[in-house]
């Protein structure tokens, strides 16, 4: 049986604020993913998108604003987060499901995204198999996950915030890249973010540097940042 590390008997640490400032922050966070979709997807024939792990639904809002004609769907394991997403993004078809064994066939998608989800899975290869199965040939898969090879992990060691009880599949950027390409994908972009895993870099004035790179670059083609960011194309 498929197993995930989310404990729904405890308060969810992933319920996000409705404040205007937080919504702006989230929009900036997802701007890079929107940019990658526009760059690598066949936007003239871009009709459907699936998000694995909708969280609180902020990415769905960003997509609706950028791609108003695209059919949006989502899967969320935690019913509490799913309820929030359905209220925040009623235009999207979001269901409860497990990233390792969902079955939405005969539906297929032009773009599938998953942000900070795969590290919660005991069997990430199962999710990659589902992504490959549900993605149209030539479709784009965008994934982010904590980077075990990042400077934050190396400097903070056991205090690194990526080390959590529910992060059961942590890997370095190169290891993630190899795993995904071995499951039927080719690399379009492979890199990582900046230094958000180092507390000092999140405080003023250094925090402004982090925000500058987030807003204007999103991610870089290097392997030492906080989160791995990968854009892959189904062969």
Write out the residue ranges for each language-model feature.
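A short His-aromatic
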Residues: 116-120
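Conserved N-terminal segment of class I S-adenosyl-L-methionine
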Residues: 1-107, 111, 115, 125-128, ...
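S-adenosyl-L-methionine-dependent methyltransferase catalytic module, highlighting the catalytic core
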Residues: 6-32, 36, 100, 122-131, ...
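A generic structural signal for alpha->beta connector loops
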Residues: 69, 91, 138, 184-187
């Amino acid at each position: 049986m498929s197993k995930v590390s989310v404990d729904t008997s405890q308060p969810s640490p992933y319920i996000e604020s409705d404040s205007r400032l937080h919504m702006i922050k989230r929009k900036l966070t997802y701007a890079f993913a929107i940019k990658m979709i526009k760059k690598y997807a066949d936007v003239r024939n871009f009709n459907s998108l699936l998000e694995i792990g909708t969280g609180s639904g902020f990415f769905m809002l960003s997509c609706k604003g950028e791609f108003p004609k695209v059919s949006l769907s989502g899967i969320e394991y935690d019913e509490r987060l799913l309820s929030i997403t359905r209220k925040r993004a009623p235009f999207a078809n979001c269901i409860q499901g497990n990233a390792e064994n969902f079955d939405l066939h005969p539906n297929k998608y032009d773009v599938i995204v998953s942000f900070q989800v795969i590290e919660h899975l005991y069997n990430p290869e199962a999710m990659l198999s589902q992504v490959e199965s549900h993605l149209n040939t030539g479709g784009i898969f965008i994934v982010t996950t904590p980077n075990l090879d990042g400077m934050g992990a190396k400097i903070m060691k056991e205090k690194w915030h990526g080390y959590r009880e529910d992060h059961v599949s942590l890997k370095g950027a190169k290891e993630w890249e190899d795993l995904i390409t071995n499951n039927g994908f080719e690399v379009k972009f492979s890199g990582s973010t900046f230094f958000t895993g180092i507390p000092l870099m999140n405080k003023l004035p250094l925090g402004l540097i982090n925000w500058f790179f987030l807003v204007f670059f999103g991610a870089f083609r290097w392997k030492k940042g906080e989160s791995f960011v990968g854009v892959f194309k189904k062969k």
